[in-house]
């Protein structure tokens, strides 16, 4: 099918976080292929402006959308359900990017015909919520290879410069442990991220300057694509140096939480730094560039879009009573989840506020918890 009109939802299109950038990169590639992506979120900002500049329509109220999409690519369940109820004859796919976020919990609704997990951890979440395995697809995360080009110079024989690449990096999270490990190894460390007021709109322009990058998930994948050696690390814990021997195990985990099984201890991180090997980093980068490019992933998504549209056309429309009851069940669960998460975030914020050195970052993490980031 050509010229599909795809409505992509997300809880925000403001900061440059994982799902926001997934929307941006997917929409831009769809546009390049002759499709008509439209982005919807009630919170607009930097990423929304990037999309508009690239001629992708962005709306924060579906009543302002004068056309009916062929398919809903739904990220975060409240925005997905808003779109499903606004467009009663349109099928949908729910995408799950985060196994711990209440915003990402799977929704049971008659017109959600497929569920996409970006890693095996999210696939497990879908299975735990009674989503039939036949409706689940695992489509691993990707990197825009046209933006994140291979570095021009080979890595140094021993790491000279390192980057901590994380929006959660601060004095109250994993920055001290990483800094101490780098100091022991005589490596200069820079930090890029929102908590240190050093975030950048063009990470692809700086990643190639570093021999070693500490990151997780999408950020780690981008650093690998450029050619840096990568140690998995974030505020939740530390993980291994990514090597040719462990890449196949870590890739289905999205280089994320489940891979961060070690404590945030300078000694642990230093052990991983000592595994630095320019030849192995180059091999990892070649593997990423051969298997994790955005074009092949959007090929897969396009095929899935077409599959869902055909299935919906063949099977006919859903009964209104069935949809109404599914919507009622969703609202009931939404109230339960919202109440539980509001209480948990309040307790977390109050606990952090009582610790002087942790207060600011703790409140930020509590807010992030509520937003599902």
Regions found by a protein language model. Give the residues of each.
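Conserved donor-binding/catalytic core segment of Leloir-type glycosyltransferases
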Residues: 7, 116, 137-147, 154-172
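A short, glycine/small-residue-rich beta-strand->loop->alpha-helix junction that serves as a flexible
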Residues: 10-22, 170-173
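A charged, aromatic-enriched C-terminal amphipathic alpha-helix characteristic of glycosyltransferases
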Residues: 18, 153-155, 260-326
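Short His-centered aromatic/hydrophobic patch
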Residues: 74-79, 96
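Acidic anion/phosphate-binding donor-loop and adjacent secondary structure
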Residues: 104-107, 127-128, 142-158, 201-202
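Donor nucleotide-sugar binding/catalytic pocket of nucleotide-sugar-dependent glycosyltransferases
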Residues: 113-125, 132-148, 315
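Catalytic binding pocket for nucleotide-activated donors in carbohydrate/polymer assembly enzymes
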Residues: 218-283, 287
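Boundary detector for helix-to-coil junctions that initiate low-complexity/charged tails
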Residues: 321-373
